[in-house]
Amino acid sequence: MRISSTLLQRSKQLIDKYALYVPKTGSFPKGFEVGYTASGVKKNGSLDLGVILNTNKSRPSTAAAVFTTNKFKAAPVLTSKKVLETARGKNINAIVVNSGCANSVTGDLGMKDAQVMIDLVNDKIGQKNSTLVMSTGVIGQRLQMDKISTGINKIFGEEKFGSDFNSWLNVAKSICTTDTFPKLVTSRFKLPSGTEYTLTGMAKGAGMICPNMATLLGFIVTDLPIESKALQKMLTFATTRSFNCISVDGDMSTNDTICMLANGAIDTKEINEDSKDFEQVKLQVTEFAQRLAQLVVRDGEGSTKFVTVNVKNALHFEDAKIIAESISNSMLVKTALYGQDANWGRILCAIGYAKLNDLKSLDVNKINVSFIATDNSEPRELKLVANGVPQLEIDETRASEILALNDLEVSVDLGTGDQAAQFWTCDLSHEYVTINGDYRS
């Protein structure tokens, strides 16, 4: 059945994503300040340089990071990895980030430029090996270091640091490229021990997003004291279930970095892997990272739909994730979602070619596939395949209603175990081609 043009157009009405997803206020972790400026790297003169600074001196800070797996790792990635390794995740007190130029595939000169950015900030804060650097933007072009250097000096020289809401929001804006809205999330948490702490996160990304991260930068800061090894374990666990579970277009960038700083401004005992609160904090960080990662998908270039791919009852978490990833990255699935076409064959095809670690994870006679409505309308579930048998007489009207939603779920029940994984993806539209065809201009 062909979808009516009226229904198709209704689902593609512009969503005011800025109003929906950008907070109006917030409270932020103690002991952090942020600064920002428009250095002139971006042609349109918008904000393109930011600094996150730990001002708490009551105890040493800790840091952790997860970097891109792309073989062409950008200069900021290689440089920041070296800083973290040398520091062993301790006493990292600043992050400097620019947008508009990725400083990627720029050779030795690019490495020197990244190091200059680090050295400039280290000099301003009077510390050595205490700064991480990140860049995002066009690949293959050198940074305009005169503008970057002037911008860093301006941020520090004019005391452009603040801890208020607008300061944090402007830093979130300074890392945007093709993003249609800045991604800023902040939340307070309470542990069973009674300790209260805050997590604040920022991210950028709208295209080149796929598992193992893509053109994606993410920062999470907290005032909770966390031992460096415990922090790295938390962030790795959280990233595996958040930023590595999103897909926009299946492209993996050279600059991906997710980092987390813990400054210990809260007066409580440091969390380590043996602490009674460790597992609770790990889960809270994971849920927080998922919220932040989902904003990246919601801002997918040209997207009109946010789609949760839920794979459950698998033998292994890893295989559940592989299947969810395969569905999420399928261009045919994504274009069918855009066209509101209930083509479940494309979903089964993506499941079938998924490169599973254990072939026993998939039994074609046990699989169930459904579309799930997220707007509380009934019937909530529309079964497409039941115990391996295609439902040939599905309710096409109901299918059209579900696929017209801005948010929907694809549910896959493998029926072979008890493990589950989620991915978040979006549809693929004509607008995606337009945005990326004009990117460098």
From Swiss-Prot:
A molecular function GO annotation: glutamate N-acetyltransferase activity
Site (Involved in the stabilization of negative charge on the oxyanion by the formation of the oxyanion hole): 136-137
Record's keyword annotation contains Mitochondrion: yes
EC assignment: 2.3.1.35, 2.3.1.1
Keyword line: Acyltransferase, Amino-acid biosynthesis, Arginine biosynthesis, Autocatalytic cleavage, Mitochondrion, Multifunctional enzyme, Transferase, Transit peptide
Primary location class: mitochondrion
Segment annotated as transit peptide: 1-8
Activity regulation comment: Inhibited by ornithine.
Residue positions of the active site: 215 (nucleophile)
Enzyme category, top tier: transferase
Site note Cleavage, residues: 214-215
GO cellular component: mitochondrial matrix; mitochondrion
Reactions catalysed: N(2)-acetyl-L-ornithine + L-glutamate = N-acetyl-L-glutamate + L-ornithine; L-glutamate + acetyl-CoA = N-acetyl-L-glutamate + CoA + H(+)
Record's subcellular location: Mitochondrion matrix
GO BP annotation list: L-arginine biosynthetic process; ornithine biosynthetic process
InterPro entries registered for this protein in UniProt: Arg_biosynth_ArgJ, ArgJ-like_dom_sf, ArgJ_beta_C
Residues that coordinate or bind substrate: 177, 204, 215, 301, 436, 441
Processing after translation: The alpha and beta chains are autoproteolytically processed from a single precursor protein within the mitochondrion.
Pathway recorded for this protein: Amino-acid biosynthesis; L-arginine biosynthesis; L-ornithine and N-acetyl-L-glutamate from L-glutamate and N(2)-acetyl-L-ornithine (cyclic): step 1/1; Amino-acid biosynthesis; L-arginine biosynthesis; N(2)-acetyl-L-ornithine from L-glutamate: step 1/4
Top-rank lineage group of the source organism: Eukaryota
Function: Catalyzes two activities which are involved in the cyclic version of arginine biosynthesis: the synthesis of acetylglutamate from glutamate and acetyl-CoA, and of ornithine by transacetylation between acetylornithine and glutamate.
Similarity comment text for this entry: Belongs to the ArgJ family.
Oligomeric form and interacting partners: Heterodimer of an alpha and a beta chain.
Protein name listed in UniProt: Arginine biosynthesis bifunctional protein ArgJ, mitochondrial
